[in-house]
């Protein structure tokens, strides 16, 4: 099995800028330490599966509020890219994914395991 690939801070900052350009929002990084912590959480060795690592990444990026604006967009985009980098993709309707992110991850503060279960249910190998 090949080593798991992870996004860098530089890549996430570039993606954040691209998302703000496309969808609007206030630019700015609020807390580099929170961004760094979110990106390193999946690498901690605590999360056995790719779904669990993706869940930790999504949860941390969405809830740490490292950016002034666009945290949820970045969280979902980076998680999707992380999965793609590692040979998988999320297959969920946009409305369903948005509802899960806002209602479960943000508002209900779903556990990392609940998020991992949702990701696992929507995960497909990339061909």
For each feature predicted by the language model, list its residue ranges.
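FIC/Doc superfamily catalytic core
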Residues: 1-127
């Amino acid at each position: 099995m090949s080593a798991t690939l992870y996004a860098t801070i530089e890549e996430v900052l570039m993606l954040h800028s691209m998302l703000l350009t496309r969808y609007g929002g206030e630019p700015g990084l609020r807390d580099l330490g929170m961004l760094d912590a979110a990106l390193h959480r999946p690498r901690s060795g605590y999360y056995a599966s790719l779904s669990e690592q993706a869940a930790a990444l999504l949860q941390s990026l969405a809830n740490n509020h490292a950016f002034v604006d666009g945290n949820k967009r970045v969280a979902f985009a980076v998680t999707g890219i992380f999965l793609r980098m590692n040979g998988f993709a999320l297959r969920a309707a946009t409305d369903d994914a948005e509802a899960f992110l806002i209602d479960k991850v943000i508002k209900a503060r779903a556990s990392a395991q609940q998020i991992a279960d949702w990701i696992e249910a929507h995960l497909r190998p990339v061909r």
